[in-house]
Design a protein with these regions (language model features):
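N-terminal subdomain of nucleotide-sugar transferases
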Residues: 1-52, 156, 402-423
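Acidic donor-binding loop of glycosyltransferase active sites
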Residues: 155, 265, 281-299, 313
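Conserved donor-binding/catalytic core segment of Leloir-type glycosyltransferases
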Residues: 1, 200-228, 242
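Acidic anion/phosphate-binding donor-loop and adjacent secondary structure
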Residues: 169-173, 185-200, 219, 389-390
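Membrane-proximal helix-turn-helix segments that form the acceptor-binding/catalytic region
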Residues: 78-82, 101-112, 124, 138-157
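Carbohydrate-associated surface elements
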Residues: 163, 184-185
Length: 423
């Protein structure tokens, strides 16, 4: 059973890759996640994966809003986990953060012989600090505590990069053998370059593309300021910009874009299909990642970087540690948070087609030969093998129902039979 709260499945690419890979290797997989406009079904089976979704009736704003969302989603997840236990059964819960609160479910199900895996997507304390500029308060330290409890509860931990591995070893005091670096490599079967579509440039010679979530910490406001400088101060009026993705900050960013007088050449698409995404990325001349420096961003692997590289696109980004590891020579790096220098780096690439081609080819080969999911997924299977070897369970590839599940199922069937007899 995989639990994810941030995004619905299959929109959450990491979780979907994990689920399908496990299924392809013989595991029975269920997922609990939120609904969305794109994925409104409460239950469906996709590619053999049982997906259970719940509705979140409000959009989180501010700390209290996020807290309410986390509590509501946690309760819905707990409810659905019981349904999965009864209907499908499971031996392992894999909880993806944020939030770092599902260790409580892990502890509960450990009472019935289930194991708990922590899939560490985000450094929650550092993300909170990036959102609310608070590193000293009670809430920051509470998040540190929740992270430690989650790491302690987990039998094994999946992390996205070496920086997160260090956190698991140092802050969580995990054994090295229990921490697996599972990089979210792109799926080359899903992401494939297509013929460029000049119409997407909206009558201008160049297209610059941003892909990703639009939350307060994602730096899209930095990008808009860089675009303003590039267009009005460097007189680059020959460039269209497209911003692809959704998130809680979208409407505020659209208003900012309108107020800056850039609505004619900066366009927000919202979330798009894989086919439309391939058209945009195949057409773009330059792709950008404006994540500003924070401890969270500096230590996090940004999936957009790898997806740009699949399409052989040169990248402009702020000089952050894990972005540098992923892109290497496929990107030009601006001093962190310097929007003018960021704009200048875009200008350099627009003026140098040979540089763009060389950087793009390097990045594409790095993904194809090293960073694609086909190369990065083995630690996922190794982590599950470690869990099942410890359990010495014969159900490693087809989870059996626990005694509790069977008892509950018998009670359920008894109630149904009683009601049927009453009719």
């Amino acid at each position: 059973l995989i639990i994810v709260q941030n995004l619905p499945v299959p929109l959450d690419r990491r979780v979907w890759l994990e689920a399908t890979t496990l299924h392809d290797h013989g595991y029975q997989v269920s997922v609990i996640c939120p609904k969305s406009k794109e994925y409104p079904a409460a239950h469906e089976v996709v590619d053999g994966i049982q997906i259970h979704r719940y509705h979140i009736p409000f959009e989180a704003r501010g700390f209290l809003g996020y807290a309410a969302e986390f509590i509501y989603a946690w309760l819905q997840t707990a409810r659905l986990s019981l349904r999965v236990l009864l209907r499908e059964g499971f031996d392992v819960i894999q909880a993806c953060n944020p939030p770092d609160t599902y260790f409580l479910l892990g502890l509960f199900y450990k009472l019935f012989g289930k194991e708990f895996i922590f899939d560490h997507h985000d450094l929650s304390p550092e993300m909170y600090s990036a959102k609310f500029n608070d590193r000293r308060g009670l809430l920051y330290h509470a998040l540190i505590l929740l992270e430690k409890l989650t790491l302690k509860t987990a039998k094994v931990v999946l992390v996205t990069n070496e920086s997160y591995r260090d956190v698991a070893l140092e802050r969580g005091r995990k054994d090295q053998a229990d921490v697996f670096v599972l990089r979210t490599g792109p799926d080359l079967k899903r992401l494939r370059p297509v013929e460029p579509d000049p119409q997407l440039k909206r009558g201008r010679p160049y297209l610059v593309c941003y892909l990703g979530e639009m939350c307060p910490q994602d730096g899209v406001d930095y990008l808009l300021n860089a675009i303003h400088y590039l267009h009005f101060w460097q007189q680059r009026t020959d460039v269209s910009f497209v911003l692809i993705g959704g998130g809680p900050a979208v409407e505020e960013l659209k208003k900012m874009n309108q107020d800056m007088g850039m609505a004619d050449f900066v366009h927000f698409t919202g979330r798009v299909s894989d086919e439309e995404l391939a058209r945009y990325l195949s057409t773009a001349d330059v792709c950008v990642d404006p994540d500003p420096w924070s401890e969270w961003a500096n230590n996090s692997t940004m999936n957009k970087i790898l997806e740009y590289m699949v399409f052989a696109k040169p990248i402009v980004a702020f000089d952050l540690k894990e972005i540098h590891y992923s892109a290497r020579r496929a990107a030009l790096y601006a001093r962190p948070n310097d929007v003018r220098l960021f704009a200048q780096k875009i200008n350099v690439l627009l003026n140098n087609p040979e540089m763009r081609a060389e950087m793009g080819a390097y990045g594409q080969q790095r993904v194809v030969n090293e960073l694609a999911w086909e190369h990065t997924h083995p630690p996922l299977l190794a982590a599950y093998a470690r869990v099942f070897n410890r359990k010495k369970s014969a159900t490693a590839y087809k989870p059996a129902r626990s005694a509790l599940a069977l008892s509950l199922e018998r009670i359920k069937m008894g109630i149904m039979n009683y009601e049927e007899a009453g009719r």
